[in-house]
């Protein structure tokens, strides 16, 4: 079970809302979000309702302002609690429809280019666990949540291009 608290003001001040499950529309509970406290679980936050728009992955911890979660503004309109899974395994392919060179990954990777010489990934096969894909190396840039399943082309995970810099398992290390 997870627990996250959203605060309208920086530094955990102002009106707040506590949440322990997925919410497709947080607008009725707060008008802006400038700080967050994650007491348990891993969460994906979305700037738009219905799990749309830019995404932000948060683990247990305190985020006193939106820059701490790499946010571009104070808009959080939906959230998803990421289920805990024991093992993680995915396959990346350099071309669409699982073509080209394939690599299987079971651990976080801060630079796909340095480790595998990939700067673009066109398809994924998420076999176990939930993953967070980052557009840039060292877990920076746009983020995308990958749940178990098939991603035949980059549009399937919501991206506008095939640029992938790093991957991280969606796990709470505490």
Swiss-Prot record:
The keyword Transcription regulation does not apply. GO terms for molecular function: structural constituent of eye lens. Residues 2-40, 41-83, 88-128, 129-171 form the Beta/gamma crystallin 'Greek key' domain. Residues 84-87 are annotated as: Connecting peptide. Signal peptide: none annotated. The keyword Repeat applies. PROSITE patterns: CRYSTALLIN_BETA_GAMMA. SMART domains: XTALbg. GO terms for biological process: lens development in camera-type eye; visual perception. Keywords: Eye lens protein, Repeat. Belongs to the beta/gamma-crystallin family. Crystallins are the dominant structural components of the vertebrate eye lens. Has a two-domain beta-structure, folded into four very similar Greek key motifs. This is Gamma-crystallin F. It comes from Bos taurus (Bovine). The gene is CRYGF.
